Swiss-Prot record:
Pfam family for this entry, one: OMPdecase
Subunit structure: Homodimer.
Catalytic site: 68 (proton donor)
CDD domains linked: OMP_decarboxylase_like (cd04725)
Keywords: Decarboxylase, Lyase, Pyrimidine biosynthesis
Protein name: Orotidine 5'-phosphate decarboxylase
Statement: the UniProt record of this protein carries the keyword Lyase: yes
Pathway: Pyrimidine metabolism; UMP biosynthesis via de novo pathway; UMP from orotate: step 2/2
Keyword Lyase recorded: yes
GO function term, MF aspect, one: orotidine-5'-phosphate decarboxylase activity
């Protein structure tokens, strides 16, 4: 499909995996109009991140709140209601069926897109077995993707390696957000299952999450432009 620069900007989510708000603000300023979507995880959420979320939204940026919620249904539902009021665009929760259903009900009427986390991209088969799961990462991701669709979730988070197969499971309407994206010729970091930007989009990803290759670059803006160019390449 033909994708223009603008929609690629909407599809690139920069992970603000930095120690404090000051560094996050610096990065957002550096990246300027090139980036319209940011991911905020635990690290920033617990260091003044909620105010920062509001600042980003006021600056007309979209926020992907990566909280990977998992608790009793009622507790998750109340959290989702409050997060929806913030004006956040995406929120992650672990893809457990009853939790997802409760969250979907709580987010009704808001613009919040709920994403089910299938399997963490840092986990391989041995890790899953150690954690007490019998399934392979692929099998578990399939099961959870199916359950996310049945619960009425907005999308799923999965490794780009499973994206093509999972896209068939969830259909074309749901978001498929893939972390573990590394531009051509870069280091894997701590993710065991990684893929290049264009390849991930061609595999069915709707959004790419990129953190380390941008935030650790000598020039984050140049790195971002390179990734956007890789995303557009071959459209």
């Amino acid at each position: 499909g033909v994708v223009d620069d603008n929609s690629n900007r909407e599809r690139l989510i920069v992970g603000l995996d930095v120690p404090n708000i000051k560094q996050a603000e610096k990065l957002v300023t550096q990246l300027g109009d090139e980036v319209s979507f940011y991911k905020i995880g635990y690290q920033l959420a617990f260091s003044g991140g909620m105010d920062f979320v509001q600042d980003l939204i006021q600056a007309r940026k979209k926020v992907f709140f990566d909280m990977k919620l998992l608790d009793i249904d009622h507790t998750v539902a109340r959290a989702v209601e409050n997060i929806a009021k913030l004006g956040v665009s995406m929120l992650t929760l672990h893809a457990y069926p009853t939790v997802m259903k409760a969250a979907v009900a709580a987010a009704k009427g808001s613009d919040l897109c709920l994403l089910g986390v299938t399997v963490l991209t840092s986990m391989d088969e041995a890790d899953l077995h150690n954690a007490g799961y019998k399934d392979s990462p692929k099998k578990l991701a399939f099961k959870r993707a199916e359950q996310a669709r049945e619960a009425g979730m907005g999308g799923i988070v999965s490794s780009a390696l499973e994206a093509a197969a999972l896209r068939k499971v969830i259909g074309s309407d749901m978001a498929l957000v893939t972390p573990g994206i590394r531009p051509m010729g870069s280091d894997k970091g701590d993710q065991k299952r990684v893929m290049a930007p264009r390849q991930a989009l061609d595999s069915g990803a709707s959004h790419l999450v990129v953190a380390r290759p941008i935030i650790q670059a000598d020039d984050p803006l140049v790195a971002t432009k390179k990734i956007l160019a890789e995303m557009a390449d071959g459209c």
